[in-house]
Amino acid sequence: MFRLLLVSALVALSIGAVPKERSRRPLLDGRIVGGENADIEDFPYQLSLQHYGSHTCGASIISTTRAVTAAHCTDGSSTSSFTVRAGSSKREQGGQVVQVQEVNIHPDFDYWIIDYDVSVLRLPKLTFESGINAIALHPIGAELAVGTNGIISGWGTLASGGSLPDHLQVVEVPKVSDDYCQSAYGSITPRMTCHGYEEGGKDSCQGDSGGPNVAEGYLVGIVSWGRGCASAGYPGVYTKVADREIGKFIRSNL
């Protein structure tokens, strides 16, 4: 079955509302499947995006005052409802917690097909230290070779319908060809890139949405959507940071 990443559910729980299934696309459940515990000092760009104090998505630091996440993580919610936690391997304690000051969603974001799935967050100036630092953006027009591993991190659930882990998780998954991803889903746009194993078993999947996909020292993708969780034949789909429209939008909001 298509997964809904539990973003709507997590947000609803934090405000006591019943979530509506608005999306035609299967949003990634945002969990790390087949991964292991990670130390924030090894992934200092990782943020927990919190909605009324509860973890709802991942995000990535790209400067002292900017972070990026998925548009579907912030769509429909007020800026004042969001904070981020930086510099902690634990999603509920430690590090720096700051109020999000501004949310800039890509103007062409399409919730129904999950295209242009990127938001830039403006933050108070973060103090870079051990466990808090920026990740470089993949250059516009750059291409990652098929088979190159992407490093996915976050606090998403470890099993379908399970509770969120307290400790940061990480997994590596290889890039697959656009043709393979197109054959799996039938409708992949140039703003999307796909990673996964043909046999399944490892994946991003409830709470990791908006989080980083890092390869060769660059932020190459943003956790976006997919079918199932680590399901054979269905790679995870990520917003492609090197796409010209995505890359220009992010840089125009720095």
Whereabouts are the PLM-identified features?
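Protease-domain processing segments flanking chymotrypsin-fold serine proteases, especially trypsin-like
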Residues: 1-68, 81-88, 193
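Conserved H-D interstitial segment of serine endopeptidase catalytic domains
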Residues: 29-30, 49, 67-70, 75-111, ...
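Chymotrypsin/trypsin-fold serine protease catalytic domain
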Residues: 19-21, 98, 103, 118-124, ...
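Short Gly/Pro-enriched turn/cap motifs at secondary-structure boundaries
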Residues: 37-39, 50-52, 109-113, 163, ...
